[in-house]
Design a protein with these regions (language model features):
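Topology signature of small-to-medium multi-pass alpha-helical membrane proteins
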Residues: 1-163
């Protein structure tokens, strides 16, 4: 019995740590795009924010010479709530909330599926192997995250409320 409780707490801490890592990587991905003008995939960041950033980077091409805040500001308005959502989910998962852990798992599963679709598009377009390495590592990293979140959702306490 004591070993099971210890495993549950460790799984919840691991899942919360993973969500904190995803939130940090997502924020760094977004800031890197707008500060340096290029995408740097930190393997565990969310695809949702990368797609949002890509739209606003594309919009930054016209007019030329637009200030940084003019292009990055709207994208960060979308990215910041997503990062805050990840932080709230991490806190709730650390308290071993079953439904929140399940929601986190499914949210990350959808994100992994989006990365799989992007990877499949690269493969079908006959991209060079060097270009496929980083998306492949991203899928591996997301699979590890899914495993951690799945374990936390299985061993979390069952609560009636979503909060």
């Amino acid at each position: 019995m004591r070993e099971t409780v210890s495993t549950n707490i460790t799984g919840a801490r691991a899942a919360a740590g993973w969500l904190y890592l995803v939130a940090a990587a997502t924020a760094l991905n977004s800031l890197t795009v707008f500060n340096y003008g290029r995408f740097v995939d930190l393997i565990v960041g969310l695809s949702f924010t990368q797609l949002i950033d890509a739209v606003f980077v594309g919009m930054a091409l016209e007019p030329r010479g637009a200030p940084w805040l003019w292009t990055a500001g709207p994208a960060l308005m979308f990215d910041i709530p997503i990062v805050l959502l990840l932080l709230v989910l991490a806190v709730k998962v650390s308290r071993r909330r079953k439904r929140v852990a399940q929601f986190s798992f499914w949210l990350y599963a959808v994100d992994t599926f989006v990365f799989l679709l992007m990877f499949a598009a690269n493969v079908t377009s006959h991209a060079r192997l060097r270009i496929l390495v980083l998306p492949g590592l991203t899928i591996v990293g997301h699979t590890v995250g899914l495993f951690i979140l799945y374990r936390a959702s299985r061993h979390a306490r069952c609560t009636c409320a979503l909060a």
